[in-house]
């Protein structure tokens, strides 16, 4: 939906308008102009595996955003092997823009970029500077329901394994279908 690296100008123009509008709403709400009040997006496609070209467009268009939008943007790793791993986000996006990376533990299982989860989470955490890093955590819905017809990337209803932050001081956003029930389950698992 919001694709700063798109080769289509109308998609980029709509994305810039959308992200700037989100930042304006955050401003009206009095939220901090930092990644603490993040606008989290995926980089989007690679357009034939052209990571360098896509990243060049993404970074150039990122700099067209309002200052308050730029200050809040974070990027998240993808759940497909041919897409944006935490490593690629670091190498192609963060190094140019200093945009923080939200490491999604579940997505990492499908797009590792050659890193372990611990290495990827540590790398992503290093991009947050003085703001507490954020990670996303969900589990495999097909395992939860013992149904191989469900896509492995689909988020679970709840949790059966506690989140492993690898000793890092991070905020964990729980991404499960049963929302608060999942939170209570996670609290039990971590107790």
Q: What spans do the regions from the language model cover?
A:
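Conserved, mostly hydrophobic/aromatic
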Residues: 73, 104, 172
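Histidine-acidic metal/acid-base catalytic patches
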Residues: 99, 109-191
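Active-site-adjacent pocket scaffolds in enzyme catalytic domains
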Residues: 83, 103, 111-112
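Active-site acidic/histidine proton-transfer and metal-coordination neighborhood
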Residues: 2-100
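Short loop/turn segments at strand-loop or loop-helix junctions that form parts
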Residues: 1-4, 41-45, 106, 138-140, ...
């Amino acid at each position: 939906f919001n694709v700063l690296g798109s080769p289509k100008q109308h998609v980029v123009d709509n994305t810039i308008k959308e992200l700037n509008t989100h930042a304006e709403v955050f401003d009206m709400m009095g939220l901090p102009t930092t990644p603490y009040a993040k606008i989290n997006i995926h980089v989007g496609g690679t357009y034939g595996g052209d990571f360098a070209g896509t990243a060049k467009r993404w970074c150039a268009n990122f700099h067209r955003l309002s200052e308050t939008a730029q200050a809040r943007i974070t990027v998240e790793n993808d759940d497909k092997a041919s897409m944006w791993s935490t490593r690629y986000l670091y190498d192609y996006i963060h190094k140019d823009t200093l945009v923080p990376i939200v490491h999604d533990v579940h997505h990492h299982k499908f797009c590792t970029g050659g890193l372990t989860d611990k290495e990827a989470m540590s790398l992503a955490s290093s991009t947050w500077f003085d703001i507490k890093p954020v990670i996303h955590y969900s589990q495999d819905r097909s395992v939860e329901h013992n149904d191989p017809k469900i896509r492995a990337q689909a988020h679970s209803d709840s949790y059966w394994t506690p989140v492993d932050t690898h000793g890092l001081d991070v905020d964990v956003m729980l991404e499960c279908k049963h929302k608060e029930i999942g939170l209570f389950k996670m609290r039990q698992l971590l107790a």
